[in-house]
Design a protein with these regions (language model features):
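Rhodanese-like catalytic fold shared by cysteine-dependent sulfurtransferases
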Residues: 2, 8, 19, 23-71, ...
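Structural scaffold elements adjacent to functional motifs in cytosolic proteins
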Residues: 74-76
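Sec-dependent N-terminal signal peptides
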Residues: 7-14
Length: 160
């Protein structure tokens, strides 16, 4: 019986040593993850970062683009309720795709990723994020209308 107990103890010790050795070997193989980038802590910081990455148009620039590039898609990312209430910028190629559904609906609306697109919202808070998203999706000619729909209306420019 003593031999049997001794054999079990020896077997347990061997198993523990093998597990420890294996764990020791794994620690050499495992590489710690790279340091995570600094987190952006405010929504405004996200908007500012998107604005820095995306070309911007003011009202005069948008008017010029609509005149010289009539194929430009004007993309309103406000909610349908906002558009129903106040209208939208008059443009030959207009789409209203809510910011939250943009990634899922843009390819059906604008399949050619080289199409010029100008994105806007009410006060240029959602549109920079949307324009940045379009660029990340591979759209190559995207701009943000930084003055927003509110300033377009104040200027008395055409709405539908």
């Amino acid at each position: 019986m003593n031999t049997s107990r001794w054999s079990c103890t020896l077997f347990s010790v061997v198993l523990l040593l093998a597990a420890a050795a294996q764990a020791q070997d794994l620690s050499v193989i495992v590489v710690p993850p790279p340091e995570a980038p600094a987190l952006t802590h405010t929504a405004q910081a996200l908007v500012d970062a998107a604005n820095a990455r995306v070309p911007q148009l003011d009202t005069a620039g948008l008017l010029t683009q609509l005149k010289t590039q009539p194929q430009t898609v004007v993309l309103d990312v406000r909610t349908p309720a906002e558009v129903d209430y106040s209208g939208h910028i008059a443009a030959a190629r207009f789409f209203n795709i809510t910011r939250g559904l943009l990634e899922f609906r843009i390819e059906a609306a604008v399949p050619d990723k080289a199409t010029p697109i100008v994105v806007y919202c009410g006060v240029s808070q959602r549109s920079p994020l949307a324009a940045d998203t379009l660029a990340k999706l591979g759209y190559t000619n995207v701009k943000n209308y930084r003055d927003g729909f509110v300033n377009w209306m104040r200027a008395g420019l055409p709405i539908e």
